[in-house]
Amino acid sequence: MALIIQKFGGTSVANIDRIKKIVPIIKTEIAKNNQVIVVVSAMAGVTNQLVTLCNELSSLNNISQFAEYDVALSSGEIVTASLLALALQEEDIKARSFLAWQLPMLTDNNHSKALVESITTDLLEKYLQLNTIPIIAGFQGINKSNRLTTLGRGGSDTTAALIAAAMKADRCDIYTDVEGIFTADPRIIPNAKKIKEIDFLEMLELASSGAQVLHPRAGELVMRYKIDMRVLSTFSPDTEGTLITSKDKNMENGIINSITSNKNLLKISVKSMSLSFLQVANMITQNNNHIEFMQEIKNNEEYSFITNLTDKNNLQALLTNLKDDKQIQYFTFDTEIATISLIGYGIKNDCKLLETILSKLTNDNINVHMIQLSEVKITLFINDQDTEKTIFNLYNLFKIS
């Protein structure tokens, strides 16, 4: 008997008909004599609607307001969890919904971007022994003040990975609207190939570079705890997806296996005569704002940072306060930036590879602002209007398959 965590994303639970179609997928695992725990997202579009409603009512500029914001946003997953439990019960399958405070899933106090500190699994273990399927509302936690928190965008992926780790699950299955992970975005490269099996580290680099099938925090967790994960389509449940697992790789190979892009970025330029580069960086990373790249520009007074576009409102308030206090002279935002990332083991050590890439992009009149290297990834910072062209040209140049 294996323990399987199944996570269903927003498009998988977008309406009642789709929720009903999840039931046979869960029953398939039960028929294999496996135990199942389900994690659900809000119905597609619901979280965005709740965000809009909150923004119409509040400026969201203090902790009390963000606490209420989290209560509102967490309601989407609560509705889905209860509806799926009802759908299973209608098929004579014992199931019940669980909310974060009932477990509990304890987090820190960073509302809208909370980090999970601990999960109590006693209730989950109890109901599994009673042959009852726990349906967990993803994306949410509870802090030590008994206030609901949310885990940020992609939080249901994170919930699923955390539950898999806490329960020592045999596998975590992520059900979405695509049939796995592809060598490139099929909307840009129609002949992109599905990857049958991918290493943890490659998947983490893909997720952190803009691939939409898995949130980077979930990728970090499955790699840390070595949890096998599958990415599957809710709409083609019998189709083989992509297995994320530990694989032996030749670190000297220098082969590009996939390419991805990210337009959800914000470039921040700051000038400060009183704050150091590291002081500004430390302020930006408060409240779990994530810096993708940072650079001193000149004279130890001008700094450049690239962060997630979703952090723009938080950072606008922070930097405006610093400017009002005369700790910085000015700041600017640039949203017309994107990254292209090429993923594959050994590529950092292949000098000719980078030379080939830059030569191709120069010939194509594509301006590369910055380059970032890791053992398995080359990331190019370009103008966002060149994204599709760059992906198409590099994909064909290296014949990625």
UniProtKB/Swiss-Prot annotation:
Record-linked Gene3D superfamilies: Acetylglutamate kinase-like, VC0802-like
Alphabetical UniProt keywords: Amino-acid biosynthesis, ATP-binding, Diaminopimelate biosynthesis, Kinase, Lysine biosynthesis, Nucleotide-binding, Transferase
EC primary class: transferase
Catalytic activity: L-aspartate + ATP = 4-phospho-L-aspartate + ADP
EC number: 2.7.2.4
A Gene Ontology biological process term: threonine biosynthetic process
Pathway entry: Amino-acid biosynthesis; L-lysine biosynthesis via DAP pathway; (S)-tetrahydrodipicolinate from L-aspartate: step 1/4; Amino-acid biosynthesis; L-methionine biosynthesis via de novo pathway; L-homoserine from L-aspartate: step 1/3; Amino-acid biosynthesis; L-threonine biosynthesis; L-threonine from L-aspartate: step 1/5
Source species, domain of life: Bacteria
One cellular component term from this protein's GO annotations in UniProt: cytosol
UniProt record similarity statement: Belongs to the aspartokinase family.
PANTHER family named among the record's database cross-references: ASPARTATE KINASE, ASPARTOKINASE
Protein name: Aspartokinase
Native source organism of the sequence: Rickettsia conorii (strain ATCC VR-613 / Malish 7)
Species classification: Bacteria, Pseudomonadati, Pseudomonadota, Alphaproteobacteria, Rickettsiales
The encoding gene: lysC
